[in-house]
Structure formats: C-alpha cells, structure tokens
C-alpha cells in the first residue's frame, strides 16, 4: 500500500512539474525573422511586416514589441483570433493599442473572433484605425511604394470568399494574402499572382509529443508559386499549455532579388 502511494505521489509530482513547464512555454514570447525574395519587387524598396496571429487570451508582451520595434516594421498583419469568448474587452483593446503603436495594422477574422460581440470588436478596431479586411483588398502604401493586401474571412465559420478578396488584384504586381486558416492554400491558383500568404489557426498543434500532434508545426515554404508562412501563433486555446510548439511572432522582410541581403 505504501509502495502504491509512493508511486502515485511520484506520478502526481511529475505531472505537476510537466504542467508547470508547459505553462511557462505557453507564456513565452519569440520573434522569428524571415526574408522572402519576390521577383516582382525588383527595384522596389523592401517591405517589413510584423505578423502575429492567435492572441486569444494573452496580453501581448511589451518587451516583445520593443524588440519588434527595432526592425521598424512598415505594417502589422494580424492573422485572426485576436479574441475569444470570455476575454475582457479592456484586454482586447490594450492589445490593439499596443500593436497600432508599432505600425499600421491590417486584420482578418479568425473563428474565435466570432465568439465576442462583433459590434464591440468593430468599434475597437475603428477607434485605433485598424484596417479590417473581410473578403476584400486594400492598396497599402509604404516608403513611396504600393502593394495589394488581400484578406479572406474565416473558413471554419464559412465566411470566406477568396474570389471576392482577390477581385481587384493585378497578377503582375505584388499581392499579399492574409487568411486565418491555412486551408486557403487549397483555393489559390498559380495564375492569381499571389506572392506571399500568411496564416495561423493551427497553433502548431499546441501540445505535441515528438512528431505527433493534432496539426503540423508552423513553418514556411511555397504553395502555388507563393511563399507561405503558417504560424504556431501567440496564444493558446482550451488550455493555457504548450509542448513542442513554442508560441511565436514573426518579422518578415519582403524584398527583390536585387537587395544585397536577399
């Protein structure tokens, strides 16, 4: 009996330690850097983007944002799940405030964003001059240059309309695509002229055991001739724990092949 109690106590202790490690991991802040070389940007000034998705219940770390500010980003792309049900609106507002202090913010909805009052969420976005994209595009100006940024609404909520989002793009010019769910890759065509696509949603599986998890780890690659980035995201869902899939944000430099650092 004493032996059984000892084993159970050891297991409980190990579980508590593991939970503490997973909680600490989930609350970390990591900034990853990437360079995407685009042929269409030959002769254009580089575009620097801070990308963050899946904030959920977290308050974005000010130290992380100070680190990001060193890169002087031209834009912030906010890839959905800024909020979820039960998150205080004051915290959502503070996150928006912190991001807009870094650079102009362009936002698309994620599935969890539909768990909060849309009227209140839109009011906060407008108050801080965030550009929300719902199956539409915007001409984004920076350093005397222009690119088109397309935003697709959430796929899981069946709010997406990819064709509407890319309706006014010119395949010969620089086109960026923002969509919370990476399943958007399936709707893309090479002829659409998308140069880079940014998504989150999967959390990199959030809790992984080696190679095994509910989703693949986030990463970069190419799809339909476009660069893609799928982020592990910044926050968590269901439980505030992570294992094998660190939270992450991203600083991406888009540049032409003529740039010396590309």
Language-model features: where?
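Active-site neighborhood of phospho(di)ester-bond hydrolases with catalytic His/Asp-centered motifs
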Residues: 51-53, 75-81, 105-111, 133-136, ...
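Binuclear metal-dependent hydrolase catalytic cores centered on His/Asp/Glu-rich metal-binding motifs
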Residues: 123-131, 142-179, 185-187, 242-243
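Short, charged, surface-exposed secondary-structure boundary motifs
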Residues: 84-86, 142-144, 160-161, 206-212, ...
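Beta-strand-turn-beta hairpins that frame and shape the catalytic cleft
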Residues: 37-50, 138-150, 170-172, 222-228
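Conserved beta-sheet core of the metallophosphoesterase superfamily
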Residues: 182-261
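N-terminal active-site segment of His-dependent metallophosphoesterases
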Residues: 6-7, 12-94
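Core catalytic region of metal-dependent phosphoesterases/phosphodiesterases
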Residues: 57-141
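Short, conserved loop/helix-junction motifs that constitute active-site signature segments
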Residues: 70-71, 97-102, 167-171, 189-192, ...
